[in-house]
Amino acid sequence: MTCTDTLGCVEVAADEPVTVVAMHVLSGPVSFFGQDSTGGIEIAIDDYGDLLGHEINLIFEDSQCNAEGGQTAAQKAAANAAVVGVLGTSCSSAATAALPIISEAGLSMISSANTSPTLTEADPAKGGVWQPGYYRTAHNDLFQGRLAGEFAYHQLGARTAATIHDGSPYADSLQQVMADVFTELGGRITYQGAVNVGDTEMLPILTEIATDPPDVLFYPIFQPEVNFVTDQIQGVSGLEDTILMAADAAFSSDIMANTGESILGLYLTSPLVVGDKYEELLAKWDAKYGGLPPSAFHGHSYDATMMLLQTIESVAQDDGSGNLLIGKQAIRDALSAISGFSGITGNLSCSDTGDCATGEALGVYQINDMEAWPPEIVLPE
């Protein structure tokens, strides 16, 4: 066999496995995201079995939840000539740094949890950082931000809102979309500001917000900062009646224990997956790991893995003796052509810049019970 692929090929000998790298956050305060996604990957590989007679070799790299982690993980993946594809990252900040490296190496990367609109925006003038080879089964936060803005205005009856982000591409983009939608509907934004990752003292920003008390505070930030904001706002004069709303960055089964009873009443926008396929996944999770997944993107991760493995199998050339030749551009072309993929999270069709999901698998939850996980679903009703 001869490689004619414009980006080159990965050769897999008959006695070698097909190698895939999973780049997720495996350490630190939000490692539950990585646990959630890697569980979905492992179950998908269990279900898939061999790929054209080859075992699947899954390599884990800790992309953390920052640019440095994403860059390091991507460099390791790109340096390994055996790698056929990449699954990840968890966080948009890690993906922003990883993407140029992965793209330059000719690899394809499918994320199950990146949601920042910038990652699939091709125009740098609009903040876009998209590079060829990037795909995601997670929603674009243009959908989640709209959901948050509409829910605040229509269901909560809010007419004023404030937002807090942490400077990350994810949080900054999401709060801005929410603010734009809320304003379009007729609402007024009283404050937009940021905390730093690592901050523990939130009273200064909360006191500033209280100078013009909003009906709702939207703060799509991660633990532990989201815990500190939720807890410390309770003692701020003027914010006693402000409704609190966070997002999928805070959607974790340990958020109640990490925050305390001040968490009660908090709204969360986050993925909402339903159906028989999803129930089967949960049963497999319980059998393999015990209990329930710790966050919300395990279904998306399962879908991303199945998409990648099916794509690899569809483009691989087999010499009849089990030796494979897998074209890198062929993988990209096949992923970009995906339409109507029947996944656990819905029907997926990939855009020219890698957005494969719609906003169908999104909902709003409210934490009303310190012992219940997942929280009560309030939208859709």
PLM regions and their residue ranges:
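Extracytosolic ligand-binding ectodomains
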Residues: M1-E381
